[in-house]
Regions:
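Conserved G1/Walker A P-loop phosphate-binding module
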Residues: 1-87
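Active-site glycine-centered loops adjacent to acidic/histidine catalytic or metal-binding residues
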Residues: 63, 125, 155
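Conserved, well-folded catalytic cores of nucleic-acid-processing
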Residues: 32, 51-55, 70, 85, ...
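Conserved glycine(s) of the Walker
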Residues: 21, 161, 252
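Canonical P-loop GTPase G-domain recognition
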Residues: 118-119, 128-186
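Conserved C-terminal guanine-recognition region of P-loop GTPase G domains, centered on the G4
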Residues: 53-58, 80-151, 222-227
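P-loop NTP-binding site
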Residues: 190-305
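Catalytic P-loop NTPase motifs of RecA-like helicase/translocase cores
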Residues: 44, 68-69, 101-102, 130-131, ...
Length: 305
């Protein structure tokens, strides 16, 4: 496949305000669940690299955290990762919601995009939530703000028009051999994917004040015949949060585990024995050492990784 002189390969990044559907779109394009999704903003914390290999080319997607106003060191890290990525890729996909209103969050992104020479494709997501006739008006609103190479309306949830988007991305990639083997779908370590799946379930089940104050670490992951034993810890910032995560008689923790386990089993293609614990690390989102321990390393940005 790679000997084909017409073969293309390159990097695309998905940016946008928190909760516009970046992870849902990437999962749809790849055809497998890699990035966690929830109805709460700032679900994605690291750049997640996933790979789509086609007959005509290979697209390596970087799903970045949403660009937002940072409230702590973790927030700073997330914003820096997103903005640093813009100059490292061959094409940028900017995801927006179908609306005529351009808020402060979008204005901030527009300013960032004006600073880069990387081609930008505007992706208007969630088209399944509006009338088709209204989409043209949304396109006109955004077209006045920036010179986009392409504008593609899609529904990440339903998969509408995503095939057109893939062809648009390929158009802006350079010719060259694939970066990854054709059976590769992500460069994330398996432990990190398991931790993210557990965090996704916690995000969905827990009340508003807790989710962004949690991290998940996988302490142990061992195969025992046809079973994989996994020990993981949910880290929170307050003693009061610990009680909520565990729940009455351990019911909430059990619920998080029972929802995460089937998806982990599907991914590993084997039975999973999942043990969950909860630990308190006060104000971990403002501690450089703890951020590094939980996999958020600002030096990754400087190194361009």
């Amino acid at each position: 496949m790679n000997e084909n002189p017409a073969y293309k390969s390159g990097f695309a990044t998905l940016i946008g305000r928190p909760n516009v559907g970046k992870s849902t779109l990437m999962n749809r394009l790849i055809g497998q669940k890699i990035a966690i999704t929830s109805n709460k903003p700032q679900t994605t914390r690291n750049r997640i690299q996933t790979v789509l290999t086609l007959d005509e080319g290979q697209i390596v997607f970087l799903d970045t955290p949403g660009i937002h106003k940072a409230k702590n060191k973790l927030g700073d890290y997330m914003v820096n990762v997103a903005e640093h990525t813009l100059n490292d890729v061959d094409v940028i996909l900017w995801l927006v919601e179908p609306t005529n209103f351009i808020g402060a969050g979008e204005r901030h992104i527009i300013e960032q995009l004006k600073k880069t020479r990387t081609p930008v494709i505007l992706v208007i997501n969630k088209t399944d939530t509006v009338k088709k006739d209204d989409i043209l008006a949304f396109i006109d609103t955004y077209r006045k703000e920036l010179d986009f190479q392409e504008i593609v309306p899609v529904s990440a949830l339903k998969g509408d028009n995503t095939d057109v988007l893939i062809q648009c991305i390929l158009k802006y990639l350079p010719y060259g051999p694939a970066f990854y083997d054709e059976d590769t779908i992500t460069d994330q370590p398996m432990r990190q994917i398991v931790a993210e799946l557990i965090r996704e379930k916690a995000l969905r089940l827990l009340s508003e004040e807790i989710p962004h104050g949690i991290a998940v670490t996988v302490e142990n992951m061992k195969e025992r015949g046809r079973i994989c034993d996994i020990e993981a810890t949910i880290i929170c910032e307050r003693d009061s949060h610990k009680g909520i995560i565990i729940g009455k008689g351990g019911q909430m923790l059990k619920k998080i585990g029972s929802q995460a386990r089937p998806e982990i089993e599907d991914m590993l293609e084997m039975k999973v024995n999942l043990q969950l614990w909860v630990k308190v690390k006060k104000d971990w989102r403002d501690s450089d050492i703890l951020l590094k321990n939980f996999g958020y390393n600002p030096k990754d940005i400087e190194m361009g990784e």
